[in-house]
């Protein structure tokens, strides 16, 4: 998540502060963003103008594969110590765009539940980690670790390039070859994610999350029952599971959902 932000803070061919936000103001784009998940980071954009399309592709490719990743950007986007308060009340606090963002996200009980569930279901794979960043752990990341992670993972051998529209695919490939691929050699990044080993018996886990002082702890417990099912590439099993989910809990009249609500075991 920190790397997703930091690569957009200047690159080899665009050594300006925040070229991403500069393009937001100047471009004819209909969409520009960046997303991070447990096993991928995506830099999507869209525009209806051919010239703008290649301008945006130029900025995005250079940002992803040849970013500056300077220390000031790391401190801005990741974490740093700031002085706050005055006089005897002065103190040091952690700040940073991603750090503050994730502090806000992880203050939500629902987010804590989702992250805890993934941690419990996938204890032996990358999916156990909070890809956004755990606020308590973010300050342990170093600038050198961030650069090393980029060198290993942000490589064409570990990337997919997706294009859509009525522009020439041949032109797209020639552009990507000239800007990026011609400067790299193929490697094995070793980023395959193994399947989570299956358990022989069910497991129960307990996680904690903070409450406001005014909240009643007796009314703030959350419960979740989950199963590790088919491989995501097994499209038939995934479809069947989605249908079953809709039948059982898809709306207020669904039998399982209605039974749980009528039981008054808790509140939704």
Please name every model-derived segment.
Residues 6-201, 206, 213-240, 246-268:
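Charge-rich, well-structured scaffold segments of protease-associated domains
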